[in-house]
UniProtKB/Swiss-Prot annotation:
Zn(2+) 2 binds at residues 166, 169, 188, 191. Residues 5-70 form the J domain. It comes from Pseudoalteromonas translucida (strain TAC 125). CXXCXGXG motif repeats lie at residues 149-156, 166-173, 188-195, 202-209. Homodimer. This is Chaperone protein DnaJ.
Length: 380
């Protein structure tokens, strides 16, 4: 029998907030919990279904995977969280409600989170030139962080000794207290949630299982990255305490402004100045690209602001592999520092056009015709 949609199981919409999901879970878990249903197998199955849906939808990464691939992502060990993950029997009452009520009563997360407190994630800002972002590169970076302690292998205990299981919480890291009908979990005051006691702490890390150190990493920047892109290095964040998993390192990319090109997604834009004679007569010019110089044909009678698209001269997409274009906007440059002969030639050109130059300068003529009509309308 196919599984029901997790959102349907909890009775929430696909865009439900984590708070709404917890609220729905609390209501349904109380309704179907085996301690309240007298061993009804059908209701016990529903309870497991509710618990499974809750565990997937309150984990941001698992929820994203589920939204994209559905139940298939978690079958045959693909993502965890299936019915097989519950084990036999009814489980611990506090294990069910711990993560729901922990925030309310200050008890922290459920018991499975107490002993494995993952290290914090880190962020590194990577500043790149446009050329580096487009071509990709390998960068060596230095990160001040927490790393696992070598002498004690992350346990926190001195060589030759071992951490002992906490006798107060029996290794759970949390203790229960009854408040009416509910059994609420709180952090164990003896071991501070670690589930173990270190009688002989390591001299290097003083019992933490980790030490501060500047770590050197080699980061491969893929070709085509852009400002706002983020590269995740799994397990390269801070080491957790007492051998707990490390967090992740996120490299945040920022691309500096370029003096010639402006990037728009996978396209590049640039302004290319041309002489007024090239604009009028046409010709061939050289334009810059990220691969070197390229030829661009300018047709005669080109006006300033005209765009020319050079296919495949842009940026290769880091995701799809498609290559963008280079879009050149021509700007006609007015000559300066004219000598006497050059001025004479320009004057001859002006005279050759005659008084009626509308066919040579249609935009200018159209503008002044519009101005004349504007003032004529004002005086009517």
């Amino acid at each position: 029998m196919s599984k029901r949609d997790y959102y349907e199981v909890l009775g929430v919409s696909k865009d439900a907030s984590e708070r709404d999901i917890k609220k729905a879970y609390k209501r349904l878990a109380m309704k179907y919990h085996p301690d309240r249903t007298s061993g009804d197998k059908e209701l016990e199955t529903k309870f497991k279904e509710v618990k499974e849906a809750y565990e997937i939808l309150t984990d941001a990464q698992k929820r994203q995977t589920y939204d994209q691939y559905g139940h298939a992502a978690f079958e045959q060990g693909g993502g965890g969280g299936g019915h097989g993950g519950f084990g036999g029997g009814h489980g611990d009452f506090g294990d069910v409600f711990g993560d729901v009520f922990g925030d309310i009563f200050g008890g922290g997360g459920g018991r499975r989170q107490s002993r494995q407190q993952r290290g914090s994630d880190l962020r590194y800002n990577m500043d790149l030139s446009l050329e580096e972002a487009v071509r990709g590169k390998e960068v060596e970076i230095k990160i001040p962080t927490w790393v696992g302690c070598d002498p004690c292998d992350g346990s926190g205990a001195k060589a030759g000794s071992k951490p002992k299981t906490c006798t107060t919480c029996h290794g759970a890291g949390q203790v229960q207290m009854r408040q009416g009908f509910f059994a609420v979990q709180q952090t164990c005051p003896t071991c501070q949630g670690q589930g173990q006691i270190i009688s002989n702490p390591c001299d290097s890390c003083h019992g933490q299982g980790r030490v501060e150190k500047t770590k050197t990493l080699s980061v491969k920047i893929p070709a085509g990255v852009d400002t706002g892109d983020r590269i995740r290095l799994t397990g390269e964040g801070e080491a957790g305490m007492h051998g707990a998993p490390s967090g992740d390192l996120y490299v945040q990319v920022s691309v500096r402004e370029h003096r010639i090109f402006v990037r728009d997604a996978n396209n590049l834009h640039c302004e290319v100045p041309i002489s007024f004679t090239t604009a009028g007569l046409g010709g061939e010019i050289e334009v810059p690209t990220l691969d070197g110089r390229a030829k661009l044909k300018i047709p005669s009678e080109t006006q300033t602001g005209k765009m020319f698209r050079m296919r495949g001269k842009g940026v290769k997409s880091v995701r799809s592999g498609a290559i963008g274009d280079l879009i050149c906007k021509v700007v006609i440059e007015t000559p300066i520092n004219l000598n006497e002969r050059q001025r004479e030639l320009l004057e001859e050109l002006e005279e050759s056009m005659g008084k009626d130059s509308s066919k040579n300068r249609p935009k200018e003529q159209g503008f002044f015709d519009g101005v004349k009509k504007f003032f004529d309308d004002l005086t009517k």
